Amino acid sequence: MSDHPPEVMVNGRAYRWPAAPTVVICLDGSEPGYIETAIDKGLAPHLARLMREGANFAALSVIPSFTNPNNLSIVTGRPPSVHGVAGNYFLDPATGEEVMMNDARFLRADTIMKGFADAGARVAVVTDKDKLRALLGKGHDF
């Protein structure tokens, strides 16, 4: 008997519980040809194995095609009009200042990772972009 649900609902969508541990790698702003060339030259053997033995997809981006809206659409399963992060920055009309949208208060939708964590999955979020740390980790204890 399984100790987890067969699927998890997040933002109105059902996600099946993975049959095996799952890793999602998002290479933001990377032209697929760069990865293919690195693999062909033997410079990325681990990526070659992941692509050969796992699954890989060239993602379709959302508009606007900036880091924050796209990454958050991937992890929420919803467009910027729903998750609330429509750019990397916005202009604050009260101050006339540009505000970086890197604070979790701007995110209006739960992440798929949070949905699975709430259902009992062990979840980790790793990013080298400080601006994404709070957004991707919203609702987690790390």
What are the residue ranges of the model-derived segments?
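Active-site nucleophile/metal-coordination loop of metallo-enzymes that catalyze phosphate/sulfate
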Residues: 2-21, 29-142
